[in-house]
């Protein structure tokens, strides 16, 4: 028997407002524990929540960017549960009347475009954070009350690979809107995954399992891959899948049972009596719609149609707004479009991954990268020299040409000097001359490599090729 995988994702996104969802406390990451709190966050008796207008605006902006319908009437509800980092013993959320519904995003997997539906986007407040030690627990309520949006996909995802692509696209869109930085390492984007299997051709869904502790997109993919195999083996052996919540163990790559999954009835949702229902008129919707910036799909189309970039380049460059803005800044400073794309996808990305930093953490600017690329383009700097100059540029900034001169890496363009390298290479490799004359194209490349090696990468490659061809034809 063959099974079809059905996946739905619930993504929590922290809105980067200055204050919290229902209180004036700061909503900033990294503060001293319990320093960003007040009487509302601590649930003192008699205090009343006040809705953060900007958080509502940003929830609407995100909904619109995800092609959702904005509800004219929505409301807040109490989600009741007991936990030490939830001082009210309930969380203010939206149960049956969310701010956004019926959206979608398009993803690309293996060259195919697929539309993934989005059921809803609702607003809620975050809980605090518990840290468990040996024999005791610590509670930090700085995060309590931070504005969140929860984005719930339709069960349209059919593989872990599609789930990864969905998350990548969703993060990209939200980052472009400016409502969140979507940093998983800081908790501003968190994902829970629901997965079930059913025999191919069956319409009814199987029993779903919820996965938690998915701290990166890669862990989401790995957790789903493991759970897919686990459920398939269980079903093929005649077993049943229980409705469970399981935790992904990063060290083993397996999922571990946490608890039997609760249903919505367990939370005893009811209307939040201290907050009036939201009424969003058409004027309010129109004002928010005007704030939506250029989104990744629009930029991608512009890069392909107007700048002539390949689809792949355009896709990679628009994955993050930071990279896309940097690319546009560099070409605005006169850098060649394709060379800039190659450097950002190649040398720049390699440097960022190796050092585990983002562009903003380096001394790179669109201007100084463009300066280096223009030197490559006009032949002043070879690609080999650029690879030696680039790390210095990224770490300390400055001017690429000055770095090249300070390091003694100035490209050799003097013909007499280059001719000496060329004749030495030919004298030392007579077999390559014979190979060239016999039509073996690789011989030319080998000789160029020998010349570049002898000149420590400083020979002007264009002039080397020209002189080498002349000398070969004369022998």
From Swiss-Prot:
Protein's recorded name: Aspartyl/glutamyl-tRNA(Asn/Gln) amidotransferase subunit B
Entry annotated with the keyword Oxidoreductase: no
Catalytic reaction annotation: L-glutamyl-tRNA(Gln) + L-glutamine + ATP + H2O = L-glutaminyl-tRNA(Gln) + L-glutamate + ADP + phosphate + H(+); L-aspartyl-tRNA(Asn) + L-glutamine + ATP + H2O = L-asparaginyl-tRNA(Asn) + L-glutamate + ADP + phosphate + 2 H(+)
EC number: 6.3.5.-
UniProt xrefs under InterPro entries: Asn/Gln-tRNA_amidoTrfase_suB/E, Asn/Gln-tRNA_Trfase_suB/E_cat, Asn/Gln_amidotransferase, Asn/Gln_tRNA_amidoTrase-B-like, GatB, GatB_C_1, GatB_Yqey_C_2, Gln-tRNA_amidoTrfase_suB_CS
The species this protein was found in: Staphylococcus sp
Recorded family membership: Belongs to the GatB/GatE family. GatB subfamily.
Any one of the GO BP annotations: glutaminyl-tRNAGln biosynthesis via transamidation
GO molecular function, one term: asparaginyl-tRNA synthase (glutamine-hydrolyzing) activity
